[in-house]
A protein has these predicted regions:
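Sec-dependent N-terminal signal peptides
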Residues: 4-14
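Boundary at the C-terminal end of the N-terminal hydrophobic targeting segment
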Residues: 17-19
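Residues embedded in well-ordered secondary-structure elements
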Residues: 21-22, 90
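Short N-proximal segments of mature Sec-exported proteins
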Residues: 22-72
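Compact alpha-helical subdomains of small soluble proteins
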Residues: 51-124
């Protein structure tokens, strides 16, 4: 009986430990990483403030750090980001998508907006 209780508790604890980012959340985070990377590499002449490039790079770092913290392997994360970057690289700045990504970070990562601000400050 103790063995079964231990197995059930172990299973529950394991599932709770990996509950930080669902597949849907991962997809959104990868899409946002692709959008942010595209923002950073916008061609010259595109209307875009330099501070937004910094915020984009900081956001990518915060998303990756959080993903690794909740148990996503670096290899899996990088593969997802690379696909998203391929999808968005060379596209024009999309303010709506970028703002949606800011909201995703603020709402799905504990202290996400503050973490982005902190990383931006370290870029100088």
């Amino acid at each position: 009986m103790k063995k079964y209780t231990f197995i059930i508790l172990s299973f529950l604890i394991f599932n709770l430990a990996h509950a930080g980012m669902s597949n849907s959340d991962k997809s959104k985070a990868w899409e946002c990483s692709g959008i942010y990377m595209a923002n950073y590499f916008l061609p010259s002449g595109e209307q875009f403030e330099y501070s937004m490039k910094e915020k984009s790079m900081a956001s990518v770092k915060v998303l990756k750090t959080y993903a690794l913290e909740v148990g996503i392997s670096e290899k899996e994360w990088d593969e997802g980001v690379n696909k998203a970057v391929d999808k968005y690289y060379g596209s024009k700045y999309d303010k709506t998508k970028t703002e949606d990504c800011h909201s995703i970070i603020a709402n799905s990562i504990p202290n996400g907006a503050e973490k982005v601000k902190k990383v931006v400050q370290t870029l100088y």
